[in-house]
Amino acid sequence: MLPCLFPAYGSVVACKPSAIDRSPFGLLSQPKQTNRTLIRRPKVTKAFMAIEAMRHCSSSSSSEEGGAAATTAARSAVRERLQLAPPSPSPSPYDTAWVAMVPALRRGGGGPRFPQCVAWIQRNQRGDGSWRHAAAAHQQLGSSPEIVTERDLSSTLACVLALARWDAGSEHVRRGLQFIGRNMSVAMDDQTAAPASGSVVSFAAMLRMAMEMGLEVPAVSQADVRDRDAGVICHGGRTEYTAYVSEGLGNIQNWNEVMKFQRKNGSLFNSPYTTAAALVHNYDAKALQYLDMLLDKFGSAVPAAYPANIQSQLYMVDVLEKMGISRHFVGEIKSILDMTYSCWKQRDEEIVLDMQTCGMAFRMLRMNGYDVSSDELSHFSEPSSFHNSLQGYLNDTRSLLELHKASKVSIAEKEVILDNIGSWTGCLLKEQLLSSAMKRNPLSEEVEYALEFPFYTILDRLDHKRNIEHFDITSSQMLETAYLPCHSNEEIMALGVRDFSSSQFIFQEELQQLNSWVKESRLDQLQFARQKLDYFYFSAAATIFTPELSDVRILWAKNGVLTTVVDDFFDVGGSKEELENLVALVEKWDKNDKTEYYSEQVEIVFSAIYTSTNQLGSMASVVQGRDVTKHLVEIWQELLRSMMTEVEWRQSRYVPTAEEYMENAVVTFALGPVVLPALYLVGPKMPDSVIRSQECSELFRLMSKCGRLLNDVQSYEREGSQGKLNSVSLLALHSGGSVSMEEAVKQIQRPIEKCRRELLKLVVSRGGAVPRPCRELFWSMCKVCHFFYSGGDGFSSPTAKAGALDAVIHEPLNLSCSV
């Protein structure tokens, strides 16, 4: 594979793929050198550090082997992380310190119950006197080493208290207190900037504990200790929250209430520090067994959360999908989803009791074809489920966002639970966006994006680019002081960058060849026709982006251009005689027939359809192992007949019923020649019985009806001025004046949503005659229709979607966004 160039001081340029990645059917010429240089000069960021291992200069003779080796190594690192038995999570100093404070004897005497934790604390103090989580230390790469967070102070103070409690390591204690004193302004700033989070309550309470133990924190007096405890306790409906931060509330906590949240494994919230804090104040055999298990498993230190396997694995899968590289890890992802589904059916506490994990699991399982009922989310159907939870008190945006995303994966006309969840989560997220605190939240852009663009309006490659450019290689999922493992983020970033940049090179070559085809076919000479090659190719590249599906993209774009030409010919370009001549030629399908061309326009249009369809038929017949050309011809014949029907209606001023209109309109929307032939090239065998099955017909009907209605909503005014009827104007017309055009537009939204949900159900359901990769094509086109026709007629506009087109095909990745 030729090297993907990652300039150390510029944007990523398109990467040239290996010949083995290209089309197996010879539609594309051999790779050519491109003269298009797309280089910017963004600042150097951590994103470039993530891809250094894969950067090879083009002048190096070993760059091809090196690039391939780096890709293989990166995939192996990610694959290791995806295993069901992942590497041990990194130790958490904060949690380990609280475990170290647990006494050996039931009433608090006899020294530490876990002396190995005390020893670990002594061994792992950093040079500046602090104790920091490994993820926090990693975050300093490429940035100032002086950055200190309130979380670092909490971890350090907890370790100081653990050592002081057992009179161990006086020098460690002194250095730790000095670190806290030097950075005390961080804690004070955090306390004044936001409501009391768990770590702030803990820090204030731990400062009080330190003073009660006779420890002197430099630059800290009694007046500096902001005791938030009373405010938390008297805040109604926050019992779960106060239980979670129980280590910071000490003797003022109601420990009997706390233990109501104990899970089957003996823990409180799967949190080592919360469980340990409970044991410090209130002996419990099951809680002690939980901590014993952790130390048996991890040795002398504990992680920030355990178990957190399901959430961390789902998060990893989600990241791979967002970066556009999940196809490289199909087997590993299937194992994770199978395991998650098994836990889902057993109502595992790690899923059911956690809002974020439950939302992610539901969305990912449903989209991957697992049978999950929205009834399992009934405990989240009302906003009180959030307000009265730990996530609610922490104003946990991530949990809200994941639940909101889950609500959009609806596959029935009425899924009341999902509709309710979507309503209240959407309202709360909008409220959060208006708050000043949200402006400091790195999730704010993601929330805005999710609210404005539901997943069914987003084209995959456009989304991948955004996610790559905003990917934070140092980020990790966290709640309070709990970090989840975040290994291999550099490899994920590198793979995403290489994959996207390589695909851009392919896209640019394919589009160049398609432009040549338009000229060779003389389609550019048709003055009446809209020139929509770029848009059609973009819609293919943005949804069918893998290198091996090159022929599908070429077909999609060619037939998209041809259907647009035919549509314009029937609308404005052709006379009645020309239209009848074209229909007759397509019906006979014989270029050597004696039928004369009525005009040069007819000859150009028919020749382009005839030549392209026969070439495609030959190619598809090889893939399928049988002759499919006849079916491809039938698709064009049906389209032209239906278009002629519309012309006859218009000329005779016939007003069809809504049912008559829609039966014809699902054909004249002209997605048949684009999507149906593509089914033959995706890979799976498509016998004639399958291609003509009720299931395939229903997939086509739902996709086409959804697209047609979306188009009608945006075009009814323009078409009305041309004397054309569509579903909006027919609804108003047949109502006898009781429905205005504005009301008709609103009413049309319901069947659009119904069609989309029913289509998604067919796509994600297991079983059926049509293979899943083929069903995905119908869903891809549905998303394309939503993309172009949500908020305007983006297809007819020459500029509305030009920026998106450039982003996917031409503009290189701008990694200056990454941090």
From Swiss-Prot:
Annotated Pfam families: Terpene_synth (PF01397), Terpene_synth_C (PF03936)
Positions of short motif DDXXD motif: 567-571
Organism classification: Eukaryota, Viridiplantae, Streptophyta, Embryophyta, Tracheophyta
Annotated organism of origin: Oryza sativa subsp. japonica (Rice)
Positions with a binding annotation for Mg(2+) 2: 567, 571
Knockout-associated phenotype: Severe dwarf phenotype with reduced shoot growth, reduced crown roots and growth of branch roots, abnormal leaf blade morphology, dark-green leaves, short and wide edges, leaf tips rounded and almost sterile seeds.
TM ranges: none
Name assigned to this protein: Ent-beyerene synthase KSL2, chloroplastic
SUPFAM superfamilies linked to this entry: Terpenoid cyclases/Protein prenyltransferases (SSF48239), Terpenoid synthases (SSF48576)
Keyword Secreted: no
Region (Disordered): 58-77
Cofactor: Mg(2+)
Tissue and organ distribution: Expressed in roots. Highly expressed in stems, flowers and panicle.
A molecular-function term among this protein's GO annotations: magnesium ion binding
Listed EC numbers: 4.2.3.229, 4.2.3.19
Keywords annotated in UniProt: Chloroplast, Lyase, Magnesium, Metal-binding, Plant defense, Plastid, Transit peptide
Biological function: Diterpene cyclase involved in jasmonic acid-dependent defense mechanisms in roots by mediating the biosynthesis of labdane-related diterpenoids (LRDs) natural products such as ent-beyerene, an antimicrobial compound. Catalyzes the cyclization of ent-CDP into ent-beyerene as a major and ent-kaurene as a minor product. May be involved in the catalysis of an early step of the gibberellin (GA) biosynthesis pathway.
Biased composition regions of type Low complexity, renumbered to the chain: 58-76
GO biological process: defense response; diterpenoid biosynthetic process; ent-kaurene biosynthetic process; gibberellin biosynthetic process; response to jasmonic acid
Note on how the cofactor is bound: Binds 3 Mg(2+) ions per subunit.
Catalytic activity: ent-copalyl diphosphate = ent-beyerene + diphosphate; ent-copalyl diphosphate = ent-kaur-16-ene + diphosphate
Signal peptide extent: none
